[in-house]
Amino acid sequence: MAEAVERTDELVREYLLFRGFTHTLRQLDAEIKADKEKGFRVDKIVDQLQQLMQVYDLAALRDYWSYLERRLFSRLEDIYRPTINKLKTSLFRFYLVYTIQTNRNDKAQEFFAKQATELQNQAEWKDWFVLPFLPSPDTNPTFATYFSRQWADTFIISLHNFLSVLFQCMPVPVILNFDAECQRTNQVQEENEVLRQKLFALQAEIHRLKKEEQQQEEEAAALVQHKLPPYVSSMDRLGDSELALVCSQRPASLSQSPRVGFLSSLLPQSKKSPSRLSPAQGPPQAQSSAKKDSFSSQATKGKDSVPGAKDGKSLLSGPVPGEASWTHQRQRRLQDHGKERRELLSTSSSQSQCAERKPEVSGAEAEPCLELHMGPVEVLARVSTAGSEGDRPEQPFIVLSQEEYGEHHSSIMHCRVDCSGRRVASLDVDGVIKVWSFNPIMQTKASSISKSPLLSLEWATKRDRLLLLGSGVGTVRLYDTEAKKNLCEININDDMPRILSLACSPNGASFVCSAAAPSLTSQTDSSAPDIGSKGMNQVPGKLLLWDTKTMKQQLQFSLDPEPIAINCTAFNHNGNLLVTGAADGVIRLFDMQQHECAMSWKAHCGEVYSVEFSCDENAVYSIGEDRKFIQWNIHKSGLKVSESNLPSDATGPFVLSGYSGYKQVQVPRGRLFAFDSEGNYMLTCSATGGLIYKLGSEEKVLENCLSLGGHRAPVVTVDWSTAMDCGTCLTASMDGKIKLTTLLAHKL
């Protein structure tokens, strides 16, 4: 507690200095110096009591103890009153013993003179009045214990412990609880970091085990593939006689089959030696290598003879030109056997064989043939290739959980998390507003249905219990999510009834409101406008600044070259800058201190759908009707830093098709992209869920990092809350479903 008090004093002192309350600061310093409670430091309180005894200041000692009783001890229950009385008695006895030990009998007599009225009726003091008159009180059996060092130390320790327990148990103001909360927060963060490291370690271990298992499977498959028939695996060390003997012992059916030779069925024709072709061979498709021909002819001849060793030897007793020629031929055959065996183990043999058998088959038709005739080696090669492609860098995020909020029954227009990251406000096309929390459990806090159509939604920044709701009839409502009622409703403009966008300043003092005239076409029109054509929002509009407290209009911004509908607005972190995206494709940057447009530039061919500041606020990102995601440098008007093309399901208009030709089209209303806390990753919409891209690569292209998925209808708006330790991604779709995905950032 003492540390918390000391730190709070420093914070209060810093705050007073920041506010310029110098007189109050001087008064605070003076009172801290004269603080009798010593900042709730037990050691200093005990030291103060001992110092008063050492200077024989009995009056100050009595006053200080009375102050402690009045300020601290009075808060205790009555059961502790005997303990307090015993400590007070021991304190005065400690003072008396000290006066006798220092030969100040006059101070001892003074003590009894001043305290006689209070002590004479107390039984525990009856024997102590003679203490100043005893020649050797330290040897007296009644007082000897109190003159020992052990008793003095025991008293000091008892007093110290009593005060310590008292300070720990006494109620403290709310401002002092922050220290304990900070410690708990730090402890939780440390535990989270330990668990995070354990999680990553387990993932790495799982990845390693899977890799080892895959390698073992590959090795096992390779061993199975390389295990050749005995008569093939022993070719390199067989002599001619043994080869003839083996061939003669094989069944005659093998020699008569079109797939007569094991080598012949796998080796490509291009690999065979023309000099070893037998003139008595059959059709070209049945030809094999010269050695294979020898096997077949010898086996056919052996069919009419009696099998045995003699027959085998007689087959080799044919005419030979000479001993040297026979040796040379034998060596050539052995070399060819080794060559054929090596070719057998290559993966290209089966593919060439398949191409040889069906040369007329097209590429699309040849693929089934390849799959039919390929051996385990080719399959293994494909698996290995797929495995190597799968060895990508570790994902930047780990999906901890994905929950669904399903209390909407029509397409979502807006879905926003409040500043604290604890609650979500969602709005659908039927005018249903839901305010719900997701931590620790998903629970609806407030629900409301608007009679008039709603087009925009924004959380108030300072009082995060309030919602700003813009309608399609020219009004803005202030809704209290805790009281579950409308606090006020203001008319913006009757001529421009559509409130397309709302943005509340971070300081909470004001908000901007974009009002536009009725659209040129209906939202329910099934045909999306062509890129670059005159869009549905190419109508006049106004950008207004309103005071949040008084709910009165402060000013109207100038929109050059002509008033146009503003689709999207966003403030920077301190509210000094406002960026807007309009239906004419122009981005305008407003100086909120001067209340004027600082710069503007043509950004998109068509409407600007969504615009946001970068995390460092040196750039602005935008998504437009032309399906482009562009980064702009705000220090140089119109300077394009990077540009990327997005799929149509990320930019809209969003289309949901149904049975019998039913088609629902929704133009973008809410945020189309959101950033993580560091601005390195971006969440966008897609047809099946949110997509996370990596920003800021050297090639200045978007890199698809993670697909959140989970949706059956197109996602129309997203949000990314980083208020908690884990990031929370919100993706809302046209079927009324909102997916809440909790991500854990992988810290490298």
Curated annotation (Swiss-Prot):
Entry-annotated residues carrying Phosphoserine: S257, S289, S294
Keywords from the named record: Coiled coil, Endosome, Membrane, Phosphoprotein, Repeat, WD repeat
Region listing for Disordered, in residue ranges: 266-368
Subcellular location(s) of the protein: Early endosome membrane; Late endosome membrane
Biased composition (Low complexity): 266-279
GO molecular function annotation: phosphatidylinositol 3-kinase inhibitor activity
GO term, biological process aspect, one: negative regulation of phosphatidylinositol 3-kinase/protein kinase B signal transduction
Sequence ranges of Polar residues compositional bias: 284-300, 345-354
Pfam families in the record: CTLH_Armc9, WD40
Protein name: WD repeat-containing protein 91
Species in which this protein is naturally found: Mus musculus
Upper lineage: Eukaryota, Metazoa, Chordata, Craniata, Vertebrata
